[in-house]
C-alpha cells in the first residue's frame, strides 16, 4: 500500500505541466499576431498620410479656383445690375409724358401690336413692362413719343350712342366678334365688339356705346327712362272696392278672367281669347279702378287654381302713362312701346298674368292723318298694332286701354282681333250713386248723436238714410241743380243738370268735403260726428267749383270728353244760381282737328 502511492504522484504532476504549456503557447501566438498587425499598420501609415496630403492639396486648389470664379461672378453680377438699372431708367424715361393714346386692335407673335391712334391704324412695338397676352380687344393703350405701347388702360366711356341690330360672324383672322349697328341717322355700320360687351348678352334694339373712328362698340347704354313711364305693381284694389259698375265688371271678368282660368274650355270650343279690352267713357267713372281690380282678381284666382296661398298671389299691372310716353326724338316712342311689351313677355313667361294698361289711349294712338303739326301717330300706331298681334302667342298677357275720346283712337286698334271687347263706363245713375256712396260712408264712421237719435241709435239705418238723402239732393231736377243750357247746331236747346255730369270721383270728393267739415266742427264745437248737413253743404260746394269749367274750352270737344254725344253743340250758357256769371257766350266750333283739348 505504501509503495503504490508514491508511484502515482509523478503522473499527475506531468499532466498539469502539459496543460500550462499549451495555455502559454496560445498567449504567445496572440501576442505575435498583435505584433504583426502593429508592424503592418506602421508600414501602411506613411502611405495614408501621403494620400491625405494629396487630397488636401487638391481641395486647396479647388477652393482657390472657386474663389477666383466667385470673384468673377460677383463682378459680372455687378455689371449686370448696373446695366439693368440703366435699362430700367431708360424704360421709365420712355414712359414719361407727353404720351398719346390709342385703341388696341390685334397682337402678333413677334411682340408687336396693331393700334388705332391719331386717326390711323399702326403696327407698333410693346414695352417690356406691358404683358401683350393681357391686352384685350378695344382696350385703351398709352403710347410714348416713339409710338411704343407703355401702359394698358381701361375701355372708353364716351362715344356715339348707336342701336344694336345683330351679331355678325366672327372675323376669321382676328377671331373677334363683330356687330351691325344703326347710327343716329339710321346709317348701318359694322363695328368690332369688345369682349365685355360680347359677354353681356346683346339683344336687338339695345343701345351701345360706339367709337366711330376706331370702329369699336364698348358698352351697353342703360336707357331705362321707360321705367319712369311704367308702374309695375300688384294692385290692391278688388271688385268690392268699386261701386255702381256691376254690369261692366261682369263683362270684363268674362273677357279677361275666363280665358286665363279656363283655357282648356276655350281650346275645346276652338274659341280665341280676346287680346285687348277698351274701357271708354267720361272721366272719373272708374276705368282705371276696374283695370287694377282685374289684375288683383286674376292673381288671386290663378294662385287658388295652383293651390298657392293668397299671400303668394302674384300678377303684374303695367300702368302706361300715355302722354309721357311721347318723345320728341324720332323712334324713341316706338322704342318705349317695344320695351314695354318686351317686359310684359318676360313677366308672362313665368306663368304670371300680366295686364298692360294704357291710360289716356287717345293721346298717343290717335287716328293716323289727324295731326296738324305732327304725324307721329303714323309710326306709333303701327308699332302698337304689331306688338298686339305679337301678343297672340302669349297666354298671360292682355292689353287694356282707357280713353275719354274713343272716337279719336285709330280704327285699326279698335277692330276685332286687337281690342276685341269694348266696354262703356257710364256715369252713375241714382242706384249706382248709392252703391258708390256706401263705399265711402261706412258704418265705422262716427255719426253725430242728433242724427242717430232720429233712428233710435241704429248706426246702419242712419248711414243708409244719409246716403238716400244725399243722392236725392244730387239727382233732383230742381232749379238749384240746373247746370247748363246747351244749344245744338240744329237750334234745339237742352237743360243739363249736375246729375248729368256726376261721377265716382265727384262722389268721393263730396264725401271727403263732408268729412273735413265734420273734423272742423269737432275742433270748433267739440261735438264729434258726421251729419247730413255736412253732405248737403259739400254738394253745394262741389257744384260751385264745377260751374266755370265748361267755358274753358271748345264746347263740342268738352261735351265729347264729358260723355255727351250727338248733335254738335254751338252754344253753352251756365245756369248756376248765386254766382256772378255772364249770360253765356257763343263759341264757334271749328272742324274737328283731332287735337286733344
From Swiss-Prot:
Keyword set, alphabetical order: ATP-binding, Chaperone, Coiled coil, Nucleotide-binding, Proteasome
Residue stretches of biased makeup (Basic and acidic residues): 1-12
Gene Ontology cellular component list: proteasome complex
Cited SUPFAM superfamilies: P-loop containing nucleoside triphosphate hydrolases
GO MF annotation list: ATP binding; ATP hydrolysis activity
Protein residues bound to ATP: 284-289
Protein's GO biological process: modification-dependent protein catabolic process; proteasomal protein catabolic process
Superkingdom of origin: Bacteria
Record text about domains: Consists of three main regions, an N-terminal coiled-coil domain that binds to protein Pup and functions as a docking station, an interdomain involved in ARC hexamerization, and a C-terminal ATPase domain of the AAA type.
Family: Belongs to the AAA ATPase family.
HAMAP family in UniProt: ARC_ATPase (MF_02112)
PANTHER family in UniProt: AAA-FAMILY ATPASE, PROTEASOME-ASSOCIATED ATPASE
Self-association state and partner proteins as the record states: Homohexamer. Assembles into a hexameric ring structure that caps the 20S proteasome core. Strongly interacts with the prokaryotic ubiquitin-like protein Pup through a hydrophobic interface; the interacting region of ARC lies in its N-terminal coiled-coil domain. There is one Pup binding site per ARC hexamer ring. Upon ATP-binding, the C-terminus of ARC interacts with the alpha-rings of the proteasome core, possibly by binding to the intersubunit pockets.
Name used for this protein in its record: Proteasome-associated ATPase
Organism classification: Bacteria, Bacillati, Actinomycetota, Actinomycetes, Pseudonocardiales
Protein encoded by which gene: arc
